[in-house]
């Protein structure tokens, strides 16, 4: 399966809305984040058991964001 098939909301986000960041840095405690030109939209937990779990959490969060913000 493709990344777009596994994480359709992440794919839509990076195609149409903004970008994601994965990993730790000096500015955030979260492992995965979604951002747009206005800044941080969502940030996940500080740790996930797997990268798959982090991407699933991100995809679910973006699905909720699309529903709330764009009425999808």
Which residues are covered by each model-predicted region?
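Mixed-charge, Lys/Arg-enriched low-complexity segments
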Residues: 1-2, 36-72
